[in-house]
């Protein structure tokens, strides 16, 4: 069985992935610049993969966790902020959100990789960290990311 800390890690990771997929779809369809659209495509693809990998790690360990069916209020607000934005304003909001969301994801993964109490999850966090750090690096180069 999972500790509360591991359970919280999984839920936060799942919410982050879910937000990235939804926001990425919007960026892919509504992004004004090609850079934003391509980044959105990559987020959908990479975070779908991460969701599947995390599910496999949990299954292999016999710890099925029901991940949230809907976004939490904070991520929902972020999606709503994108929904009402148009054109360059959309690109700017998406870019700024992506930098902060990936900073948060890096911190979450680093923390669990260092002190998580489930070995399989810790290994997954370590492996995932490099990809998410790369996402952060790319997000920081998006047009409008500087605010």
Predicted region positions:
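His/Met- and acidic-residue-enriched segments that coordinate or traffic transition-metal cofactors
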Residues: 1-147
